[in-house]
Amino acid sequence: MTHRFLEACRKQPVDRLPVWMMRQAGRYQPSYRAVRANVGFLELCRSPELIAQVTVAPIDEFGFDAAILFSDILVHLPAMGLDLSFEKGEKGKGDGGPKIANPVRTRADVDALKVPAPKKDLPYVLDGVRAIRAALRDRVPLIGFVGGPFTVASYAVEGGSQGFTRLKTMLYAEPRTAHALFEKLTQAAIVQIEEQIAAGAQAAQIFESWLGELDRADLEEFAFPYLARIAEAVKRTGVPSIFFSTGTTAHLEPISKLGYDVVSVDWRIPIDEARRRAPGVAIQGNMDSTVLLGPKEVAVERALSIVRAAGREPGYIFNLGHGIQPGTPTETVKAVVDAVHAFAWK
């Protein structure tokens, strides 16, 4: 079966624009909140049955053109030797941010990290992928994902605190330690995404959310080489690859040459400019998720303005510039999806 999302990833013509949204399974959904009323976040991430339930729900509720595996970019850290937990939020069930009790601070800490073996250490993720594929019945494709090395390192080194001071200091004070850490995290990302694809994921997104913290020189030394290796690993599997980051539009040209099929951009760049500056890749994005918190009519018009600006050329996927925020009205999400699907050039 041909899927318009996968065709758009490969810059092929589609019958209508594909749309999905980051965090399309999340706290804005009553169905998700009902699940979370009974289980903690990590408990949810470790239940294949619940992973499938919350992953498939947005497809049924909103008609998205792709599902994305429900998991977390840090779910593998315990297998690497780090003590991961999620702070208690308002509901007391781990809705808050991640905390790492034994953060990575020294070369000895890096050397002690183990590269996970997903079949042994993360079977619930792979079983979740298989359960999702069975539940979807090929209605839409499934996107697997991992976190990028810098973003995962920011949590592993900082321990959950806000900011990037310790990690960025490591780049300058102990560059060999930083490279050793990024090497371990790159290996971890590659084995995870390869196993997700082997289990049935039909595309792969790399979330390098905090890459905008780095300048060009640091990107070229500490980020781009590792990200290119992940892209090459995905390419060997034959499924499309998507790169996501925020705050990096100044570096769009080199990012578009890392080897990914799709580059997902945030709202800080006009979508037509992104397409001009990165002609070799498909573009995904890029509505500010905060727009969805405003009037429904405003969100629909903003979405359509982005679609028009993206132009007629194949290789465009409508998405947000970041994840859907808690409190977003579900009727607004549905209205935007329907409007993008109904759009046609006159």
UniProtKB/Swiss-Prot annotation:
CDD domains: URO-D (cd00717)
Catalytic class of the enzyme: lyase
InterPro entries named in the record: UROD/MetE-like_sf, Uroporphyrinogen_deCO2ase_HemE, Uroporphyrinogen_deCOase
EC number(s) recorded for this UniProt protein: 4.1.1.37
Keyword Lyase part of the UniProt annotation: yes
Membrane-crossing residue ranges in chain numbering: none
Entry GO MF terms: uroporphyrinogen decarboxylase activity
Pfam family, one: URO-D
BP GO annotations: protoporphyrinogen IX biosynthetic process
This protein's pathway: Porphyrin-containing compound metabolism; protoporphyrin-IX biosynthesis; coproporphyrinogen-III from 5-aminolevulinate: step 4/4
Catalytic activity: uroporphyrinogen III + 4 H(+) = coproporphyrinogen III + 4 CO2
Protein residues bound to substrate: R23, Q24, A25, G26, R27, D72, Y155, S209, H322
Subcellular localization(s) per the UniProt record: Cytoplasm
PROSITE patterns per UniProt: UROD_1, UROD_2
One GO CC term, this protein: cytosol
Record keywords: Cytoplasm, Decarboxylase, Lyase, Porphyrin biosynthesis
NCBIfam families in UniProt: hemE (TIGR01464)
Quaternary structure note: Homodimer.
Function: Catalyzes the decarboxylation of four acetate groups of uroporphyrinogen-III to yield coproporphyrinogen-III.
Protein family membership: Belongs to the uroporphyrinogen decarboxylase family.
Protein name: Uroporphyrinogen decarboxylase
Gene for this chain: hemE
